[in-house]
Amino acid sequence: MEFKELVDAAEKWCTGNPFDLIFAEDVDERRLDFYAEPGISFYVLCPDNLTGGTDNFHVWSESEDCLPFLQLAQDYISSCGKKTLLEVLDKVFRSFRPLLGLPDIDDDTFDQYHADVEEEPEPDHQQMGVSQQ
């Protein structure tokens, strides 16, 4: 994806959350820097498949306070399959929700999917054993 398209997608993503895109650089590295109050910052290095650069996105923060919260997003990026910039940014946003003072979102879709399903009781099975005759 062209870097300009990534910048446009990042700017659009910022309209739905507290983060602002504060810097976009395409010279040395395809880097997007984001910031939100109270002092939450991170950057995304974007893949550059055209010139043989990195294959995956990479997220990081210069802030020691922010780094532990990025672990979820880093694990997500390194998991199987290609990710889009919006998928990565959404995962970062979920990771930072506690720092932003927002309620935590349960990211476990399995539990959400089965939340309305009532479990049927297991049928009683007769004991199998040696009969005494």
UniProtKB/Swiss-Prot annotation:
> Could you say which protein family the record assigns here?
Belongs to the MTURN family.
Q: What does this protein do?
A: May be involved in early neuronal development. May play a role in promoting megakaryocyte differentiation.
* A biological process term (GO) from this entry: regulation of signaling
Question: Where does this protein chiefly localize?
Answer: cytoplasm
Q: Which InterPro entries match?
A: Maturin
- Organism domain of life: Eukaryota
- One Pfam family, short name: DUF4581
Name the PANTHER family on file.
MATURIN
Q: List the keywords (alphabetical).
A: Cytoplasm, Developmental protein
Q: Does the keyword Cytoplasm apply?
A: yes
Question: Which GO cellular component terms are attached?
Answer: cytoplasm
Q: Where in the cell is it found?
A: Cytoplasm
What is the designated name of this protein?
A: Maturin
Species of provenance: Danio rerio (Zebrafish)
